Regions:
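Alpha-helical lid/collar subdomain of P-loop NTPases
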Residues: 1-36, 43, 50, 217-222, ...
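AAA+ P-loop NTPase catalytic core and its hallmark functional loops
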Residues: 1-236
Length: 329
């Protein structure tokens, strides 16, 4: 990160850089380094969520992006950072991330052929002292002791105290903090996200901006799949893509009405399209990509959705049936 300026050294237009009807100017870096994400030209930005994230970069707001799985929450933040050349680090708050991982710990190192105990900083003090956007993924799955470490830095000018070092770290002026979550801190209400926690409301209240990222409009979702799987972008592949996205929309509506306990995300549709190129059979690819993840009792409903969109029956086998129907074709 030595090659990156200590602070943003240029201003960019949101209208020119992101194509939105906005007069907002945001700070950016003119040079890139290894921590800047790669630009994905196929990514589609949600205007409201993008403006919320840009407010985080421009005005040092703490931004939490909430949405269902596969909507591209973390990627959304990364792609904004990529276009600002802002260094970015993601930390997944799984059950194995501990307070010591975030804060730091004493470690035995060799200095001049002698073993000595030395304090090694965790990711939080490391990022706080640098022009870095720190992203906490799966924020609502973090353990309580970990969450209270994060609470210290949620204040915009929040200083971080290293008790083991008797040292107070002042945030770098270009440090930014973001997080992504499937829930809004209320726990696993719909049964989809096991392992999520009910979050302390005092901590949720410290987030300056909470943005909700929903699934893309139909045409934009088709455009993303075309960009990811260009083999289906021609006139012959377009009807197939439209049927695939129509089926995904039916599963989402079925989930909303309680007919299904799972749904197809844009990520699932992309996986299905990629698997179609492998198996050369949309029905088989669909079974292997999504249907086999569904409960046995719900598979006839999904098969009906498939019949509506593709005009042909989908062979459905129970888990006890053994094997994939049509796998030998």
């Amino acid at each position: 990160m030595d090659g990156v300026a200590n602070k943003p050294d240029c201003m960019v237009s949101v209208r020119e850089r992101f194509g939105f009807d906005s007069d907002l100017m945001v700070p950016a870096f003119s040079a890139r380094d290894d921590h800047v994400p790669d630009i994905d030209d196929a990514y589609r930005f949600n205007p409201d969520v993008t403006l919320a994230i840009l407010a985080g970069f421009a005005r040092n707001r703490r931004v939490l992006v909430q949405g269902m799985h596969g909507t591209g929450k973390s990627t959304h933040i990364e792609q904004v950072a990529a276009r600002l050349n802002w260094p970015c680090v993601r930390v997944n708050l799984d059950g194995h991330i501990s307070r010591l991982d975030l804060v730091g710990k004493d470690a035995i190192v060799v200095r001049d052929d002698v073993q000595v105990t030395e304090f090694q900083e965790g990711i939080v003090p490391w990022a706080l002292q640098r022009p870095v956007a720190l992203i906490f993924d799966e924020y609502d799955a973090g353990r309580p002791d970990v969450m209270f470490v994060i609470q210290r830095i949620l204040e915009r000018d929040g200083k971080f105290t290293l008790l083991d070092q008797n040292r107070v770290i002042h945030p770098h002026p270009s440090f930014r903090l973001f997080a992504t979550a499937n829930t809004v801190g209320l726990g696993n209400l719909n049964g989809l996200y096991h392992g999520t926690q009910m979050l302390n409301h005092a901590q949720m209240d410290r987030w300056n901006v909470v943005a909700t990222l929903d699934y893309l409009p139909r045409d934009e979702e088709i455009g993303i799949v075309c960009a990811r799987v260009p083999e289906l972008a021609d006139e012959a592949g377009r009807p197939l893509l439209e049927s695939m996205v129509s089926l995904a929309e039916l599963t989402r509506n079925g989930f909303a009405t309680g007919d299904l306990s799972t749904l197809m995300s844009p990520r699932t549709v992309i996986n299905w399209a990629e698997n179609c190129q492998i198996f050369r059979d949309p029905a088989l690819a669909f079974r292997l990509t999504f249907l086999n993840k569904c409960d046995d009792a719900e598979r006839p409903v999904v098969a009906e959705y498939y019949q509506r969109c593709f005009g042909e029956e989908l062979a459905v086998a129970s888990r006890a049936g053994g094997g994939e129907p049509g796998a030998g074709r």
